[in-house]
């Protein structure tokens, strides 16, 4: 009897151990360029949430702390731990080739997301994909939003010269999103027949505190009373501008951002932010996770999903957000 009990216990323990092993038999390695980036924090949490719905997946999540060398080391460790796919938010897009060579050495597929590698890098490995956006689209939509509100608010034209005197807070120089948003927001305004005059343009590296400091300096400078519109490449910098304008009693100056972060949507609701552009964190996260899981399981990247892959790339569309359609994007 005791032998039977012991045997049964051993079998059950073996089954439980097997189930536990099976429950995490698909390891996916993830690196985020830095955890304290507002937008990437939302993406990271969304990926973690998606993974909870897939009990056979174990995420190995890493904070690269804005250090490409650190990220390279993290990828080496992930590969040594036997991950079946990599999901990589690059620190430096130029490092994609290095990451691909590491992945190729272990025959592991890699899904880059948010920071786009070069076409040459993607084409160099048949198991490399990218999930992101069309960077210029966000600039165009931001330009459309500004044009819409400029036409509806004649009081914004402080000197009545018919052109927008603007300052622009730029993201990381060289980052595809920063370069495209900076170029295309102004191009779209000009294409719509709206003349523009740049008073100031400088980087605040996607950061709220840096943007506040930059805006403080501009509001203390010789062009302070000429500023009619503040344009920011992302919401984090837009929020810094809003803080600075409030401190200088100039909250009536309109500010436009990109990302549609929850905090930014609250500012749109209050009127402190004139508009933003939805950079769809949840769908970027879901597409990244879906592709990585499929590839880890040996399936086609988009199998069983609604994602459309064009030349190894999934593009998640942007949407303009202001008070007129805010209810569609605010959490119920």
UniProtKB/Swiss-Prot annotation:
Belongs to the bacterial solute-binding protein 2 family. The calcium-binding site is structurally similar to that of EF-hand proteins, but is in two parts, with the last calcium ligand provided by Glu-228. The keyword Signal applies. Beta-D-galactose binds at residues 37, 114, 175, 177, 181, 234, 259, 279. Pfam families: Peripla_BP_4 (PF13407). Its main location: periplasm. InterPro entries: Bact_Solute-Bind_Prot2, MglB-like_PBP1, Peripla_BP_I, SBP_2_dom. Beta-D-glucose binds at residues 37, 114, 175, 177, 181, 234, 259, 279. This is D-galactose/methyl-galactoside binding periplasmic protein MglB. The ABC transporter complex is composed of one ATP-binding protein (MglA), two transmembrane proteins (MglC) and a solute-binding protein (MglB).
């Amino acid at each position: 009897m005791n032998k039977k009990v012991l045997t049964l216990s051993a079998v059950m323990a073996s089954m439980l151990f097997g189930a536990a092993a099976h429950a995490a038999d698909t390891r996916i390695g993830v690196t985020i360029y830095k955890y304290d980036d507002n937008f990437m924090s939302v993406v990271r949490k969304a990926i973690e949430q998606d993974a909870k719905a897939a009990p056979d997946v174990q995420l190995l999540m890493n904070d690269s702390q804005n250090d490409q060398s650190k990220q390279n080391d993290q990828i080496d460790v992930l590969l040594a731990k036997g991950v079946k796919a990599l999901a990589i938010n690059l620190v430096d897009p130029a490092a994609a080739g290095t990451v691909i060579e590491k992945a190729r050495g272990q025959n592991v597929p890699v899904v880059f997301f948010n920071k786009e590698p070069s076409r040459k890098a993607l084409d160099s490995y048949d198991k490399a994909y990218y999930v992101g956006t069309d960077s210029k689209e966000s600039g165009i939509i931001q330009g459309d939003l500004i044009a819409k509100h400029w036409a509806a608010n004649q009081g914004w034209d402080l000197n009545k010269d018919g052109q927008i005197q603007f300052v622009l807070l730029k993201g990381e120089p060289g980052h595809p999103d920063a370069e495209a948003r900076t170029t295309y927001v102004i191009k779209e305004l000009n294409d719509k027949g709206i003349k523009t005059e740049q008073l100031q343009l400088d980087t605040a590296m996607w950061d709220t505190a840096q943007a506040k400091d930059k805006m403080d300096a501009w509001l203390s400078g010789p062009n302070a009373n000429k500023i009619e519109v503040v344009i920011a490449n992302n919401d984090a910098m837009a929020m810094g501008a809003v803080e600075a304008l409030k401190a200088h009693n100039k909250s009536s100056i309109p500010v436009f951002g990109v990302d549609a972060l929850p905090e930014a949507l609250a500012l749109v609701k209050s009127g402190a932010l004139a508009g933003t552009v939805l950079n769809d964190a949840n769908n970027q996260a879901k597409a990244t996770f879906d592709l990585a899981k499929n590839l880890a399981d040996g399936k086609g990247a988009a199998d069983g999903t609604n994602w459309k892959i064009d030349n190894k790339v999934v593009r998640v569309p942007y949407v303009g957000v202001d008070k007129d359609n805010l209810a569609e994007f605010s959490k119920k």
